[in-house]
């Protein structure tokens, strides 16, 4: 892959992704799969005016060894320095960049119950800080190819060829393969905004999904809860793009108002393992049954993370004609696969979808119907059979 094109991708992440402000600190989290690209991102952040850029490294084999050998009480414990780090985030509000390259099977063979308990304890400990940061800083998730991930996507190719093909797929689907990715995203954001404005003008009350694969589902929406997509704004008015790529327009549904069965159309990578060929059944908004051909126990563990994990936090609509769907690739990565087709998310909803949310407390957002949870996990339900997958738009009464 040409370095000049990767430099443009890095610039896209710094400029359109987190939109680094003059003097603002930046935190980058990455795996050591593409070291030179991480350097490019750091460089572009400084060119954009960043104060100080700090990189936090993650290495999947170390993470796996930690979960395998570390005692649960130690895994669950939060250290003083970690709390101080979050306090510092709340005070300074750095932009945050997450560069994904994880192996979809990174934690295969690890005790998932142990992982769940540790993650739940730590998530609860840090939730107050995350709530304080919510919508007060820019963040962006983007991706680079790791060898294990590339081989999962292109199993018939050599390691080098698989990585090269995944690079090409990432840049193509991220609209970063052209001469000016920054301008391409400016135009893309305009298109997404037009779609959001149209959907919001309909005052949609309910979405209905039906497919020949077994999906037969309805979900109620919240009056005054908008569809968003593409670029977002912090409460301070700073624009940023949280996901690169992104094709979706999304909203948060009414907690407790969903019934029926949805059948997933793509695998879900969760906690370093793949959940495959699964379905989820709702009654009165809550998950009452799940089934999966692979890792059903992991799926059940996910919806048991806390009370809100069994309720929906997002309904997203994705156009059938999009770069990711047109690529024909299953990425085994939610950042990409969720933008290939319509999807739902279990767990935490989006307060920012509510009209006037800046003047609402967290409790007031919950009272209006926004779900709260420690998790937010997207899963794909869009069918390629357009004749058998429909979305019925039922407007609120005037």
List where the protein language model places each region.
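Active-site lining segments that contact anionic ligands and/or coordinate catalytic metals
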Residues: 257-259, 275-277, 284-287, 310-314, ...
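Short solvent-exposed loop/turn micro-motifs enriched in small/polar/acidic residues
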Residues: 11, 200-202, 271-273, 308, ...
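Residues in well-ordered beta-strands of folded domains
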Residues: 98, 142, 210, 220, ...
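Short, glycine-/Ser/Thr-/acidic-enriched flexible segments
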Residues: 33, 102-104, 146, 214, ...
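Extended hydrophobic packing segments that form well-structured cores
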Residues: 363-398
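Long, well-ordered mid-to-C-terminal structural blocks that present hydrophobic/aromatic surfaces
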Residues: 249-307
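Dual-mode signal for accessory low-complexity, basic/Gly-rich regions
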Residues: 289-358
């Amino acid at each position: 892959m040409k370095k000049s094109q990767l430099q443009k991708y890095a610039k896209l992440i710094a400029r359109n992704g987190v939109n680094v402000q003059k003097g603002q600190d930046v935190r980058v989290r990455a795996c050591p799969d593409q070291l030179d690209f991480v350097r490019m991102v750091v460089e572009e952040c400084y060119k954009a005016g960043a104060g100080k850029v700090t990189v936090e490294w993650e290495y999947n084999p170390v993470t796996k060894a930690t979960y395998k050998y570390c005692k649960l009480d130690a895994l669950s414990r939060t250290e003083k320095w970690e709390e101080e780090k979050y306090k510092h985030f709340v005070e300074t509000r750095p932009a945050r960049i997450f560069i994904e390259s994880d192996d979809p099977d990174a934690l295969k063979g690890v005790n998932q119950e142990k992982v769940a308990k540790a993650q739940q304890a730590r998530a609860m400990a840090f939730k107050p800080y995350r709530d304080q940061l919510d919508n007060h800083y820019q963040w962006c998730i983007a991706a680079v190819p790791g060898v294990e991930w590339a081989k999962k996507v292109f199993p018939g190719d050599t390691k080098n060829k698989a990585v090269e093909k995944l690079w090409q797929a990432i840049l193509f689907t991220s609209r970063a393969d052209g001469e000016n990715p920054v301008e391409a995203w400016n135009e893309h954001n305009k298109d997404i905004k037009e779609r959001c404005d149209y959907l919001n003008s309909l005052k949609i009350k309910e979405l209905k999904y039906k497919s020949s694969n077994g999906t037969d589902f309805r979900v109620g929406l919240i009056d005054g809860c908008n569809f968003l997509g593409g670029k977002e704004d912090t409460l301070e008015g700073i624009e940023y793009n949280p996901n690169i790529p992104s094709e979706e327009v999304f909203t948060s549904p009414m907690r407790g108002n969903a019934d029926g069965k949805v059948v997933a159309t793509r695998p879900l990578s969760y906690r370093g393992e793949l959940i495959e060929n699964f379905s989820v059944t709702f009654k009165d908004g809550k998950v009452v049954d799940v089934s999966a051909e692979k890792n059903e126990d992991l799926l059940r563990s996910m919806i048991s993370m806390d009370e809100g994990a069994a309720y929906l936090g997002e309904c997203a609509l994705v156009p059938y004609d999009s770069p990711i769907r047109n690529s024909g690739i299953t990425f085994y990565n939610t950042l990409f696969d969720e933008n290939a087709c319509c999807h739902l998310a279990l767990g935490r909803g989006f307060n920012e979808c509510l009209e006037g949310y800046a003047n609402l407390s967290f409790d007031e957002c919950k009272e209006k119907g926004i779900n709260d949870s420690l998790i937010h996990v997207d899963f794909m339900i869009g069918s390629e059979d357009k004749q058998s997958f429909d979305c019925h738009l039922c407007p609120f009464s005037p």
